[in-house]
């Protein structure tokens, strides 16, 4: 199976190179530490005697937030050191911001080609591997299995689409899932689906989603809300003149332009409408600046300081 996967992966990787190049150019940020994607992490010292190095992989920003309780739990054992990797550039930035003083090392997960994966394994030298949600990388799991390294899948979930696809290739699905030593399903449904795909009951438990274990920041007080309104330029003289605020959260290309058109129509209809844009990928900042410069409404980037007073 692994040789068949490798034969398919190489041409797929070559075909994807133009896409990666375009993505790096358009979004910026994506090229940061790109050598990690080729398995070329900074060289880590070999684990000291009595230390257990765990390779923890979280795909993107959501998973990076969700693993916080898991990291806290692992750190209760002083013999454990964590190497954290993530797949997306935004996840990498968030991981460095949140965990740089809490884990041993932070990097970007390598592309699942045998040469890159093998290089990463030689540099990280983990004693155990923890994956999150639905990450079943054949080469990564093969390297773990070949070395006799235990692998764990936490918050394991199988979407409707993935479940149907795996059912079409049952033998391959079983062989892939067999390389996971323990699975902790996000729900009873996910557990049932994984069992139908061939996971023995002794290897799986339904533990619920770790995202529910993340502590939520307390609601802002009145003074904090006032400060935030000032920073955004949404200050009003009285409660009666508070603007209508529209939020575009985790937006993708094309969605910001649509929201701007809606805002302009609302203003033309007499509504004091303000728009907050929070792109899913912060690296798209230059692209959004060009878009905002091309339309008539005043705008402000919060990271550049206090907002405009009563912007149009």
Q: Language-model features: where?
A:
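Nucleotide-activated donor-binding/catalytic signature segment of Leloir-type glycosyltransferases, i.e.
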Residues: 95, 99-108, 289-312
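A residue-level signal for conserved active-site and pocket-lining positions in enzyme catalytic cores
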Residues: 11, 56, 259
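Short secondary-structure boundary/capping segments
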Residues: 46, 174, 231, 305-306
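Short, surface-exposed amphipathic charged segments that create phosphate/polyanion-binding patches used
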Residues: 121-125, 219-226, 290-292, 312
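Active-site and donor-binding regions of nucleotide-sugar-utilizing enzymes
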Residues: 17-214, 218-219, 251-253, 266, ...
């Amino acid at each position: 199976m692994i040789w068949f996967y490798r034969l398919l992966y190489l041409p797929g990787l070559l075909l994807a190179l133009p896409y990666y190049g375009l993505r790096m150019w358009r979004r910026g940020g994506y090229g940061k530490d790109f050598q990690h994607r080729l398995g070329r992490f900074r060289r880590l010292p070999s684990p000291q005697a009595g230390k257990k190095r765990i390779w923890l992989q979280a795909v993107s920003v959501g998973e990076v937030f969700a693993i916080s309780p898991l990291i806290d739990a692992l750190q209760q054992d002083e013999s454990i050191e964590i190497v954290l990797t993530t797949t997306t550039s935004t996840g990498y930035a968030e991981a460095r911001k949140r965990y740089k003083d809490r884990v041993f090392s932070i990097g970007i997960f390598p592309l699942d080609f045998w040469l890159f994966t093998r290089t990463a394994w030689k540099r990280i030298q983990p004693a155990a591997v923890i994956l999150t949600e639905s990450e079943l990388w054949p080469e990564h799991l093969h390297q773990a299995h070949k070395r006799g390294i235990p692998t764990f899948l936490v918050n394991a979930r199988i979407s409707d689409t993935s479940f149907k696809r795996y059912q079409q290739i049952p033998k391959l699905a079983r062989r892939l899932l067999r390389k996971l030593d323990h699975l902790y399903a996000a729900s009873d449904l996910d557990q049932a689906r994984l069992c139908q795909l061939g996971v023995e009951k002794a290897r799986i438990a339904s533990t619920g989603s770790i995202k529910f274990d993340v502590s939520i920041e307390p609601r802002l007080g009145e003074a904090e809300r006032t400060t935030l309104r000032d920073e955004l330029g949404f200050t009003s003289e009285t409660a009666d003149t508070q603007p209508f605020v529209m939020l575009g959260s985790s937006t993708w290309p094309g969605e910001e332009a649509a929201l701007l058109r809606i805002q302009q129509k609302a203003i033309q209809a007499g509504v004091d409408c303000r728009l907050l844009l929070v792109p899913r990928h912060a690296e798209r900042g230059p692209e959004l600046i060009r878009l905002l410069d091309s339309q008539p409404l005043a705008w402000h980037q919060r990271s550049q300081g206090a907002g405009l007073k009563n912007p149009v």
